C-alpha cells in the first residue's frame, strides 16, 4: 500500500467517522434531549417551547456545517453511489428543515409562548418523520463507508 493509498484510506475512515458523528449528534439532541425536556414537571410548556426553539436552531446550524463537511469530504474520496444517495437524502432533509419546516415550527412555538393556541398542524409529526429518515440515511451511509474500508 502506497502512502497515497494510506492517505485515501484514512480520509475514507474519517468520512465514516464524520457521518457517524453527525448521526450521534442527531440522536443526542432529537431523540434524547428534546423528548426529555418535556418530561420535566417543573418546565412549563411555553418555557419548554422556547428552549426547543433555541435547541433546534443550534442543531440545524451544526447539521448544516456537518453536511457541508461530509459532502466535501465525500467529493474528495468518492465513496460510491449508495453512500452518495444516503448523504444526499440526509442533506436534502437538512435543507428542507432549515428553509421550510423550522420557520413554520418556530412561528408555531412563538404563538404558544405568547399564550395563544394555534390550530392543529402536521408540521411537528413531519419533522419527526424527517428526523427518522435522516437518521436512517446517516446510519446506512456510515455503515457503508466503514464496510467499504473493510472490503478494501
Regions found by a protein language model. Name each.
Residues 5-23, 73-92:
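Interfacial segments of alpha-helical transmembrane regions
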Residues 2-3, 147-152:
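Short, charged juxtamembrane terminal tails flanking transmembrane helices
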Residues 58-67, 124-139:
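Hydrophobic alpha-helical transmembrane segments
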Residues 72-78, 143-149:
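Structural signal for the C-terminal ends of transmembrane alpha-helices
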Residues 91-103, 131-134:
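Mid-bilayer segments of alpha-helical transmembrane spans in multi-pass integral membrane proteins
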Residues 31, 95-99, 136-143:
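Membrane-embedded alpha-helical segments of multi-pass transporters/permeases
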Residues 2-68, 103, 109-117, 121:
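Interfacial loop at the N-terminal end of multi-pass membrane proteins
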Residues 39-41, 50, 59, 74, ...:
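C-terminal transmembrane bundle of multi-pass solute transporters/carriers
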Amino acid at each position: 500500500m502506497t502512502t497515497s493509498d494510506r492517505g485515501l484510506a484514512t480520509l475514507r475512515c474519517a468520512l465514516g467517522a464524520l457521518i457517524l458523528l453527525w448521526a450521534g449528534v442527531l440522536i443526542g439532541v432529537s431523540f434524547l434531549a428534546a423528548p426529555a425536556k418535556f418530561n420535566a414537571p417543573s418546565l412549563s410548556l411555553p418555557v419548554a417551547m422556547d428552549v426547543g426553539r433555541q435547541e433546534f436552531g443550534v442543531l440545524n446550524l451544526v447539521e448544516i456545517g456537518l453536511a457541508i463537511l461530509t459532502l466535501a469530504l465525500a467529493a474528495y474520496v468518492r465513496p460510491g453511489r449508495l453512500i452518495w444517495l444516503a448523504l444526499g437524502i440526509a442533506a436534502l432533509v437538512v435543507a428542507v428543515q432549515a428553509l421550510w419546516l423550522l420557520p413554520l415550527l418556530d412561528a408555531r412555538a412563538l404563538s404558544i409562548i405568547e399564550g395563544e393556541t394555534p390550530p392543529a398542524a402536521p408540521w411537528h409529526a413531519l419533522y419527526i418523520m424527517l428526523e427518522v429518515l435522516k437518521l436512517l440515511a446517516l446510519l446506512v451511509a456510515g455503515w457503508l463507508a466503514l464496510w467499504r474500508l473493510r472490503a478494501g
